[in-house]
Swiss-Prot record:
Source organism (scientific name): Haemophilus influenzae (strain 86-028NP)
Root EC class: lyase
Keywords: Cytoplasm, Lipid A biosynthesis, Lipid biosynthesis, Lipid metabolism, Lyase
Stored InterPro entries: FabA_FabZ, FabZ, HotDog_dom_sf
SUPFAM superfamilies with a match to the protein in the record: Thioesterase/thiol ester dehydrase-isomerase
Protein encoded by which gene: fabZ
Record-annotated membrane-spanning stretches: none
Protein's recorded name: 3-hydroxyacyl-[acyl-carrier-protein] dehydratase FabZ
Length: 148
């Protein structure tokens, strides 16, 4: 029995799925995914990220809200790849619970974004999201998106 090849999504296709653009497109590549179940993506953190100008001068740390936004975008990609939308529908970030930050994300880091579907009901899909750097958890949260 052979292992299945990873299902990679490059930035060009990501931009067809998400409306975000620079400086708020926070997923560089999807490394693999399984519709309706999980997705693994990466965000490379450059010292040139616009947020580092003020967060914090001389001590650049990726703001936690941007880590959560990166997880939400990974969630959106999985939702778009899983569920069929009717004309004019989009997926919207609907909620976040139990967000915890465990380590800083710094320039030069490669942040791995892992999202997993918990359940889908009446147009609301719940996910777990975990962002890691070098295998260490940087952030974990429960996320929700709504189809509207």
């Amino acid at each position: 029995m052979s292992e299945q090849q990873p299902r990679v999504i490059e930035s060009k296709e990501i931009m067809t799925l998400l409306p975000h653009r620079y400086p708020f497109l926070l997923v560089d590549r999807v490394l693999d995914f399984k519709e309706g179940e999980w997705l693994k993506a990466i965000k490379n953190i450059s010292v040139n990220e616009p947020c580092f100008t003020g967060h914090f001068p001389g001590e650049p740390i990726l703001p936690g809200v941007l880590i959560l936004e990166a997880l939400a975008q990974a969630m959106g990609i999985l939702a778009f790849k899983t569920l069929e939308l009717k004309g004019g529908e989009l997926f919207y970030f609907a909620g976040i619970d139990e967000a915890r930050f465990k380590r800083p994300v710094l320039p030069g880091d490669q942040m791995e974004l892992n999202v997993q579907v918990i359940k889908e009901r009446r147009g609301i899909t719940s996910f777990t999201g975990v962002a890691t750097v070098n295998g260490e958890i940087a952030c974990e949260a429960k996320l929700m998106c709504a189809r509207r």
